[in-house]
Amino acid sequence: MIKVAIATNINFYKSTLPIVISSLIEQGIERDNIHVFNAGFDSYDYQVIDGIHYHRLDHNSYEYSPLIEIVDKQLESEYWFLVHDTCKFGPNFKKLLYNIPEGAIKLSLNNKPAMTMGTYKYDYLLSVKEKIMSIRNTDYSEESMNHWKIWGVPNEDYIMWMTEPRPLIYNDDARWEVADNDNWFGTNTQRRTEYYFSLDLYKNKSNWGQSPILKRTI
């Protein structure tokens, strides 16, 4: 079984979740296998709404927040697929997602850097729990959030590529291309859409090395 862990946060979820969730459902992902991890709140809360699991988190470590919550709360699934809230999916996504070689521990979206996105075996996540929990952040000050955003640049794929064993690349396909320069969310932030062949996945990005200042806007 694969459960989908969507990484979002208190500032962006109202704009991003309608797009990513509707795309997952359209491509045949069962509602009960979708978990939303919404970071940056003062207290924890959990609800099931329209069959989808919503975790309101009392911490914010960007895209690592779902992994932190999974190992901390011991949310079981054979595999967890971690995806950003700024993604959409094509018609082959589910078939490609479920194409997991026997014995696979980690499958990355593509070569490093892969934005931490990919599928992790639950038992493996528990085995590196201490490393995951070491980056749990509860300080929401501007200084702290900027610190962790900057920390994430050299430490991208902290668990996927920077922690043994090395992952497989999904469907042995590391190809990607820039699809367009659209902003899906109707804001003035400069964004571009990248397409990843390995999972028939589209990612709408605001940071791709085009600026020395990392954006924290939608």
Which functions belong to the PLM regions below?
Residues 1-218:
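ER/Golgi luminal nucleotide-sugar-dependent glycosyltransferases, focusing on the catalytic module
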